[in-house]
Amino acid sequence: MSTPARRRLMRDFKRLQEDPPTGVSGAPTDNNIMIWNAVIFGPHDTPFEDGTFKLTIEFTEEYPNKPPTVRFVSKVFHPNVYADGGICLDILQNRWSPTYDVSAILTSIQSLLSDPNPNSPANSTAAQLYKENRREYEKRVKACVEQSFID
């Protein structure tokens, strides 16, 4: 069944294949255009470098008027990532716009890895370490990077 959300997701997928952003990829699951698997590669010159972080993206029929639910499947130690993998990112909540597509969502999350917002923490321990003990923060991030090879 073709709906506006499904047609839009097909366009998003086509655009992602034709003009893939650096360091991110995503595709619908085999049998459901409304559920995607994605990968974000850790940005260079950050503690996340060399990591391969898996995510799921779940869309509703209200997409693109409502944002999808995006969750890390891989363990990520980050001030703006909840223990369950949920992501505290303004464009996925109150700053959402129907102009955002899957490519923009993934590149925004990749950018968040590079530039955390410790003032809006989803993980208070990570936020505190990011502000007060950067060496310990980076040590914990690197442990997640190593775990991402196994996941």
From Swiss-Prot:
Disruption phenotype: Lethality during the second instar-early third instar larval stages. Mutants show defective synaptic function as a consequence of mitochondrial failure. Its EC number is 2.3.2.23. GO terms for molecular function: ATP binding; p53 binding; protein domain specific binding; ubiquitin conjugating enzyme activity; ubiquitin-protein transferase activity. CDD domains: UBCc_UBE2A_2B. GO terms for biological process: centrosome cycle; centrosome separation; DNA repair; endocytic recycling; heart development; negative regulation of apoptotic process; negative regulation of DNA damage response, signal transduction by p53 class mediator; negative regulation of ERK1 and ERK2 cascade. PANTHER family: UBIQUITIN-CONJUGATING ENZYME E2 (PTHR24067). Belongs to the ubiquitin-conjugating enzyme family. This is Ubiquitin-conjugating enzyme E2-17 kDa. It comes from Drosophila melanogaster (Fruit fly).
